[in-house]
């Protein structure tokens, strides 16, 4: 391999018995057993046991002085381990290396934690990320990330896609998430924006005739962070010309099947099911439903319109209200304490409470039910609830009644919490498998109550369905988009759309978004001009590489599959970024910081 080593530690097996090897790596552990020193030597491929006998005094003295995380080089002979001392958990578990020479390449100060400690706080791990990355799980995660990226590149290359870089310094467009801004020194008072997506550039590459484009690139969004968000994230960005929506979906569905098979030996469905956005929201309260959970909403809005119980009747009679039931088979066994905990849980999502009915005996109707709300419901409503939910003896029905968004968010989250719980898994409410699907036919627009205007649900370059073009000017709320999301186990793996390729339609969409012609020209004139030069029909997708690898690795957070991530406060604990900068740098950028107003003293 090199003059310093002949093999990786973790790849030395019994086939090399009797051979001389040179190994380099880090000391995982050093043990002194009756005058013989054992060293677990680690590199990126795993561990090997090194045995140091005292019959080589110089080597043995060096072995006595080494400690955990010393970087060392050893030479020695591979031999079988004594019978009964084999380690089946290691690739090298049947052999050991009898050390002839040991060189300390670089000692280590005492590490702040043991690398095999699985109970470290994330703050500790991110502060000492260099050491954290030495741990086998992190090594696995980042190598898996590399493998996924390589499989993507191989697939797209075979399909005729060209890897083209697009600018990192671009124009700020205040639509959507907040931009990261970069001041221009040579253009005082002007700013670049780091890209939230290469969206417009990749469309212009289609206008330029490149036909099939991709890149694996960094994108940036200055937004509040969650477990699956980072201020900078990696996108597998793809665009193609002259394909229909169905052909685009088929192509990238095949890509994901190939990547999952080659990266982690998982066979995804031969054909991903397709679900309309409207159906996903009706059944699951989410546009990225986790189909592993065998629970669904039952629509009860009409049933509750005439009940003498305002908790249900008020939202049922409201234009933006909704009432649903969530039947949990066998849920009658859920304790009152657990119900109280669920009530607190849905409150996180804005729910004011959590009504419930335990079904003891369906045949007895009202008398077979247990709940404080039964007295507020008339017999016809009770009968309809039991009928529509398909309730059986021993079930529980939870209810959501509020604005549709609150109901969807809160009961949707409750559905997942129950499904993923020990109770859900023990009662067949969760299937531990891979459940991909396409969600299609998204609304083109959603109404922003605060700004009193329509906003793009995806982005303003998504094409409306051909039969809905007339709604752009008459009723934007009716307009459906040629948009599609690939969902897997409740995560959006990627999303895309067929794009607008005619300048006149793009202008109509801008107007529907309350962007007048002058504003559109100022912000997107270069795109409108490009579309006039015979732009081809085109569309594409963007996949979140971080999310894909997180799912494959079974990690708790995307921070576990990124080498140097930011915290939920958008900070890098390793380098202490962001940080203050020198006054001279600010002057060169023509920037002056406004001092924080001091608080008045009492």
UniProtKB/Swiss-Prot annotation:
SUPFAM superfamilies: Class II aaRS and biotin synthetases (SSF55681), GAD domain-like (SSF55261), Nucleic acid-binding proteins (SSF50249). InterPro entries: Aa-tRNA-synt_II, aa-tRNA-synth_II, aa-tRNA-synth_II/BPL/LPL, Asp-tRNA-ligase_1, Asp-tRNA-ligase_1_N, Asp/Asn-tRNA-synth_IIb, AspRS_core, GAD-like_sf. It holds the Pfam family GAD. Residues 199-202 are annotated as: Aspartate. PROSITE patterns: AA_TRNA_LIGASE_II. Coiled coil: none annotated. Its EC number is 6.1.1.23. L-aspartate binds at residues 175, 221, 458, 499. Gene3D superfamilies: Bira Bifunctional Protein, Domain 2 (3.30.930.10), GAD-like domain (3.30.1360.30), Nucleic acid-binding proteins (2.40.50.140). Aspartyl-tRNA synthetase with relaxed tRNA specificity since it is able to aspartylate not only its cognate tRNA(Asp) but also tRNA(Asn). Reaction proceeds in two steps: L-aspartate is first activated by ATP to form Asp-AMP and then transferred to the acceptor end of tRNA(Asp/Asn). HAMAP family: Asp_tRNA_synth_type1. Belongs to the class-II aminoacyl-tRNA synthetase family. Type 1 subfamily. This is Aspartate--tRNA(Asp/Asn) ligase. It comes from Cupriavidus necator (strain ATCC 17699 / DSM 428 / KCTC 22496 / NCIMB 10442 / H16 / Stanier 337).
């Amino acid at each position: 391999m090199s003059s310093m080593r002949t093999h990786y530690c973790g790849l030395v097996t019994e086939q090399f018995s009797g051979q001389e090897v040179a190994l380099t790596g880090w000391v995982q552990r050093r043990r002194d057993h009756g005058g013989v020193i054992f060293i677990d030597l680690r590199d990126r491929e795993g561990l090997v046991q090194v045995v140091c006998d005292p019959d080589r005094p110089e080597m043995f003295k060096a072995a006595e002085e080494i400690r955990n995380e010393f970087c060392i080089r050893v030479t020695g002979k591979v031999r079988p381990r004594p019978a009964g001392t084999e380690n089946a958990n290691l690739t090298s578990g049947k052999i050991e290396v009898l050390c002839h020479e040991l060189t300390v390449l670089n000692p280590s100060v005492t590490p702040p934690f043991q690398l095999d400690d699985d109970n470290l706080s994330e703050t500790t791990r991110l502060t000492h990320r260099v050491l954290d990355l030495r741990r086998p799980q992190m090594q696995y995660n980042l190598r898996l990330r590399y493998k996924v990226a390589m499989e993507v590149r191989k697939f797209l290359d075979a399909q005729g896609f060209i890897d083209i870089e697009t600018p990192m310094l671009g124009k700020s467009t205040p639509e959507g998430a907040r931009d990261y801004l970069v001041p221009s020194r040579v253009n005082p008072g002007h700013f670049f924006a780091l890209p939230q997506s290469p969206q417009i550039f990749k469309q212009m590459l289609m206008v330029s005739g490149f036909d099939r484009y991709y890149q694996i690139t960094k994108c940036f969004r200055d937004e509040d962070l969650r477990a699956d968000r980072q201020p900078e994230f990696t996108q597998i960005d793809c665009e193609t010309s002259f394909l229909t929506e169905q052909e685009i979906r088929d192509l990238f569905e095949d890509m994901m099947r190939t990547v999952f098979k080659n990266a982690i030996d998982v066979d995804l469905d031969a054909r991903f099911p397709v679900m309309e956005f409207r159906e996903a929201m009706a059944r699951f309260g989410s546009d990225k439903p986790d189909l592993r959970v065998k629970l669904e909403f039952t629509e009860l809005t009409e049933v509750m319109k005439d009940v003498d119980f305002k908790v249900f009747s008020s939202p049922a009679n409201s234009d933006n209200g909704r009432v649903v039931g969530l039947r949990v088979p066998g849920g009658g066994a859920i304790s009152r304490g657990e119900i109280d905990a669920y009530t607190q849980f849905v409150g996180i999502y804005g729910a004011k409470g959590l009504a419930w009915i335990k079904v003891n005996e369906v045949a007895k109707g009202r008398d077979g039910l247990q709940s404080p709300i039964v007295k507020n419901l008339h017999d016809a409503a009770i009968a309809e609830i039991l009928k529509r939910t398909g309730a059986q003896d021993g079930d529980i029905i939870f209810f959501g009644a509020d604005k549709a968004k609150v109901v969807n968010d809160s009961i949707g989250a409750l559905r997942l919490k129950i499904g993923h719980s020990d109770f859900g898994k023990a009662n067949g409410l969760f299937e531990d498998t891979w459940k991909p699907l396409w969600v299609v036919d998204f609304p083109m627009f959603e109404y922003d109550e605060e700004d009193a205007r329509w906003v793009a649900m995806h982005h303003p370059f998504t094409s409306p369905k051909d039969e809905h073009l007339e709604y752009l000017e008459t009723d934007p709320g009716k307009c459906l988009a040629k948009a599609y999301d690939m969902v897997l186990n409740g995560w959006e793996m990627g999303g895309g759309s067929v794009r607008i390729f005619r300048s006149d339609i793009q202008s109509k969409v801008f107007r529907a978004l309350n962007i007048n012609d002058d504003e559109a020209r100022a912000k997107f004139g270069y795109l409108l001009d490009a579309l006039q030069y015979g732009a081809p029909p085109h569309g594409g997708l963007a996949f979140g590489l971080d999310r894909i690898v997180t799912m494959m690795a079974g990690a708790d957070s995307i921070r576990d599959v990124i080498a140097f991530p930011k915290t939920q406060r958008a900070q890098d604990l390793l380098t202490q970024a962001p940080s203050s900068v020198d006054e001279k740098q600010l002057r060169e950028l023509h920037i002056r910081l406004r001092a924080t107003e001091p608080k008045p003293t009492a």
